[in-house]
A protein has these predicted regions:
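Short, charge-rich amphipathic interface segments used for partner binding and complex assembly
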Residues: 34-64
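Short E/K-rich amphipathic alpha-helical oligomerization segments
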Residues: 16-41
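Short, charge/polar-rich alpha-helical segments
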Residues: 1-16
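Domain-scale macromolecular recognition modules
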Residues: 66-68
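Residues on one face of amphipathic alpha-helical coiled coils
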Residues: 10, 17-20, 24, 50, ...
């Protein structure tokens, strides 16, 4: 079973990849094709939001296990 720290590391790596994907779309499609960019950016943006929530939850879980 993976530790919360290992899962958080993986989540952060996935966030970085999604940000790179979004940046590549931006470089490829903007400013020339803003509508196409908006459509294609939806999925990476949703995934980024999901991963951010996951990272917040994992961070809270890690902090909760640290003795005061």
């Amino acid at each position: 079973m993976k530790t919360p720290e290992a899962i958080l590391t993986q989540t952060v790596e996935q966030l970085e990849k999604m940000n790179e994907t979004l940046g590549a779309l931006r470089r490829e499609l903007l400013p020339g094709q803003p509508r196409k960019f908006a459509i294609l950016a939806e999925s990476p943006l949703e995934e980024i939001r999901r991963l951010q929530i996951e990272a917040e939850q994992l961070t809270a879980a890690i902090v909760a296990t640290v003795p005061a």
